[in-house]
Amino acid sequence: MKRVKILSLTIAVFCFFISFVEFNFSSVFAMPFYDFQPKEIVLRAEFYTSYPSSTDERKTNIMLAAKSLDNILIVPNEEFSFNKTVGERTEKRGYKSAKIIVNGEFVDGVGGGVCQVSTTLYNALLLAGLKIIEYHPHSLPVSYVAPSFDAMVNSGWADLRFINDTHNPVILRTFADGSILKVQVYGEPLKEKFIRKSVITGEIPAPEYEILTDTLREFSDLYEGDMKIISYSKAGYKSEGYLIKTVSGKVISSTKIRSDSYSAVRGKIIKGTIPRVKEPLIDSTLITVYRIKRKI
């Protein structure tokens, strides 16, 4: 993969140069030879998700990952790896702590929010008709995309990978402005159009709340007898994802591309432990005597 600086000029020169030279440059310049079939480079597909209510830390992580995915060129038959392209999500590289999913719970972790970038890319790739060879669902439903269309990643084992199975380069453009995240896929023109369809096939009831006690008194306004919801119980889902192919508005095929199960989320309620300050009782007879004496 290569980073493109000037999109249209680079592609035009690159395709022309590679396609019309009559000998293999690999023997001269030690670089691979690609048998491109130059065509007009167009916007094949785009997809966007939103994140206006995210924390500043999560927004930072999204923007860092999006920047790593912008102006990326993938030549024919080349494999793309999200993790290799974006790199490790560490504090040293500027990533912040935000909510991630671990063992079926939302917890704080460095790089929280990057999965929204991989998910947005995943959907753009589907709409662009490219060959996805690795993706992973979340264990819990996420709010920024329909069930069966998410793509979880982490720096360890979970990646998002696809192959450019077209005859020409594919270029990724990625934009994040603090509210909207958009991925565009450029390449040779598509004859068909793809539509996503998410189908809920079953629902997992939301569990009862877990009751916790604020023994460390982390909530300064939570007194004995008070209770506060710190996370909501949510239902889980069983779902299927379909990719519908159309040509000139006519449905050609509808293919089930995946089936998923998302666990229900158990919410948490915390009970206060701070003692209430009792107001001193005042004898009403004393007040009456005091008033009488003042009148005298």
Which residues does each predicted region cover?
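Sec-dependent N-terminal signal peptides of Gram-positive bacterial secreted proteins and lipoproteins
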Residues: 6-23
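Well-ordered beta-sheet/strand-loop patches within structured domains
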Residues: 25-296
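N-terminal secretory signal peptides that target proteins for export/translocation
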Residues: 1-3
